[in-house]
Design a protein with these regions (language model features):
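Short, charged, surface-exposed secondary-structure boundary motifs
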Residues: 57-58, 76-80, 115-117, 139-141, ...
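Short acidic low-complexity segments
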Residues: 10-23, 72-75, 212-228, 234-241
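Gly/Ser/Thr-rich loops at beta-strand to alpha-helix junctions
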Residues: 89-90, 169-177, 299-304
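Short hydrophobic/aromatic-enriched beta-strand-loop microsegments
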Residues: 65-69, 187-194, 313-322
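His/Asp/Glu-rich metal-coordinating catalytic cores
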Residues: 2-15, 19-24, 28, 34-167, ...
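Active-site-proximal loop/helix segment associated with metal-binding centers of metalloenzymes
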Residues: 87-97, 110, 114-115, 128, ...
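C-terminal regulatory/interaction regions
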Residues: 185, 216-348
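Hard-cation-handling environments
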Residues: 149-227, 231
Length: 348
């Protein structure tokens, strides 16, 4: 019997009596991170990393939360369980499950480049690895994040010369905090959409150091924004809310900006290839370093990525789940099928 089963409620460890990132309410849920496609309301008990707990409280409301540190060991009905850094966002964790000599690891979402706030991705040796493949095609290859940060700084400087407000679109948990760190040493006044401001306040209350942030508010005079920087979720694009910053220009921060057509279709002033997910090489590196004999692929470019792993001699299979992009990130990826041929064999 498999240590983790793929059920209609989520990833289930029968021996331990718990689910990992269930998409339906269950008795005991172990959560990899606070994004809405992995952390859902309604379960009776939640286990997560210490930094994830306040974010679950923000998003799901009061609940029965238990939190642990990375590497701390728990036993559930004789099953050994521990959390390890995934590098996706603050608090994001891989879940290591061990029982009767068998080790499985559930990655959740992850990236392999250390962003300085999410914890460096930790390869965890296992027999079976359950991975995402959001950017599981060879066309997705990230440049070092510092190069992207430099481009963002230069773009903002050019906008200021023409009196334009720079509006950066980035989802409220993960990317927004990276941008705040990126802009921390500037003398610019930083403004944020309410969703980003609320997350910022919670994180600051729990010891995180981010630059001062002003919430966008109807009572603020319009000229206060001119030449400044506004950080907003992608869902704000094209709304009446964003038009109050006129004259403004939009910069989208997403891995989907690797494909230029996405930027053209969304009429953005700039696209910055900044992702909280591993690229093609990062996915392959992570899998190699686990030493896994079996790899299950939960979401993303599952067919192409799983096929490639099988061709490399690693048993791999697709798994149907309800994971995908964080809701607001999905707005950026809806056109990806026009740019990437899913039937094309990876050529690396």
């Amino acid at each position: 019997m498999a240590l983790i089963e793929f059920t209609d409620k989520g990833l289930y460890c029968k021996a331990g009596g718990f689910y990992i990132d269930p998409w339906k309410p269950v008795e005991r849920a172990v959560i990899t991170h606070a994004h809405s496609d992995h952390a859902r309301w309604g379960s009776k008990q939640y286990l997560c990393h210490r930094d994830t707990e306040p974010l679950l409280n923000l998003r799901l409301g009061p609940g029965n939360y238990q939190s642990v540190e990375w590497g701390e060991t728990l036993f559930m009905q004789g099953v050994k369980l521990s959390l390890h850094p995934a590098g996706h966002m603050i608090g994001s964790s891989q879940i290591r499950v061990e029982y009767q000599g068998e080790v499985w690891v559930v990655s959740g979402d992850y990236k392999t480049e250390n962003d300085g706030i999410s914890g460096a991705f930790e390869p965890v040796r296992c027999h079976t690895f359950i991975t995402e493949s959001t950017f599981g095609l060879p066309i997705y290859n990230w440049e070092p994040q510092q190069l992207i940060y430099n481009r963002i700084h230069n773009w903002i400087a050019e906008n200021r010369k023409t009196g334009k407000t720079s509006v950066l679109l980035a989802y409220s948990l993960g990317k927004a905090q990276r941008l705040l760190r990126c802009l921390a040493e500037t003398d610019l006044e930083l403004f944020a959409h309410g969703a980003i401001y609320n997350a910022d306040q919670v994180l600051k209350q729990h010891g995180w150091a981010f630059p001062d942030l002003t919430r966008v508010h109807p009572e603020l005079p319009k000229d206060r924004y001119q030449g400044g920087v506004v950080i907003a979720p992608p869902s704000a694009d094209g709304s009446a809310w964003i038009r109050k910053f006129h004259p403004y220009t939009v910069g989208i921060c997403s891995g989907w900006m690797q494909v230029r057509g996405n930027r053209r279709r969304r009429n953005a002033g700039a696209g910055f290839v900044l992702s909280d997910h591993a690229d093609w090489n990062g996915l392959l590196q992570a899998i190699r370093e686990t030493g896994a004999e079996r790899v299950y692929v939960t979401h993303g470019f599952q067919a192409a990525f799983s096929r490639y792993l099988n061709e490399q001699g690693i048993f791999s299979a697709e798994v149907k789940t309800e994971y995908g992009q964080e809701e607001e990130e999905a707005l950026l990826s809806e056109d990806q099928v026009h740019e990437a041929n899913l039937n094309e064999e990876p050529n690396v």
